[in-house]
């Protein structure tokens, strides 16, 4: 996985976190500074906003907005100039308790250049410009064709989506002879022709907008018999879409299963596509498991140990993996406890651990960090590859459910 892909994964996690917060009033500050923009002008704008915020009537809202702006200005002093891809700052009071201030700041240098300049103080953080970066743009058009049905879909990233299911009125073959047979065959040919035109119209509606945006990388067509070749060779598809046909494949199924089979059968054509690479990767992981080669491991403790030893060749993390690492510490006697748990379990743990089990003090502090981000950092430090496994493929779902979404290919066997 490229460094950019790892950045995209971490960005997605941060966006999800930011979207989970809601202010008690319009007191959450979002600031987008585009690539190449003068950071001194931003500082000037924030000073002006600070002056305006002093007129806010609500005492608590005024305090929180001023506190957020102070944190933002303090942070911007760390930069001599705007980072190469721009900078997004999110600051605000995220405390769940009324009257308690917990102002946090997130500074994000995005993996792609920011083009928008924005300042907003609202009840929620503005994440849309970052979400647009996360949207998978490259797509492959998929069409399965039979005499009496067709399915149009898209392969976008690792997800196959059905756009249209079409059925025809093409009659079956008849045993009648003579003129009746010839007339029946003409009707059949005409109905087939009309159905092909309808498939092409729906394909144009689905694919041409993507082509205009430069997002359509190719079209793959499949079916069980000669109908697919008739569709491709006939003058049905829009001339610009005909140029994008990169493969015609024999398949047995139709509908959503047909689209899945089409992607699988076209794996040579799509060898560099994410969904095909992911399927092969997880199949290799399962193969090592069945053969008991000792060259894979899974589970947080085992993967962490392998990373610390520098034994990991490729780290596999599911998009669904959401564990956090929590350190509880007694500030009176120094007692510490380190655990891995879900975000929900952390809230329960925090509520229950009111007294130090060693000295009874209530002076307990908690530190929390994302396990996936920690393991990615360990992988990068040891030169290991990182692959993010989606939940959009059957293999990705199996990896998440059977192995908790965490595994690794090893460079060598470890004890």
From Swiss-Prot:
This is Peptide chain release factor subunit 1. Directs the termination of nascent peptide synthesis (translation) in response to the termination codons UAA, UAG and UGA. The keyword Transcription regulation does not apply. HAMAP family: Rel_fact_arch_1. Heterodimer of two subunits, one of which binds GTP. GO terms for cellular component: cytoplasm. It holds the Pfam family eRF1_2. It comes from Thermococcus onnurineus (strain NA1). PANTHER family: PEPTIDE CHAIN RELEASE FACTOR SUBUNIT 1. Belongs to the eukaryotic release factor 1 family. InterPro entries: eFR1_2_sf, eRF1_1_Pelota, eRF1_1_sf, eRF1_2, eRF1_3, Peptide_chain-rel_aRF1, Peptide_chain-rel_eRF1/aRF1, Ribosomal_eL30-like_sf. GO terms for molecular function: translation release factor activity, codon specific. SMART domains: eRF1_1 (SM01194). It is found in: Cytoplasm. Keywords: Cytoplasm, Protein biosynthesis.
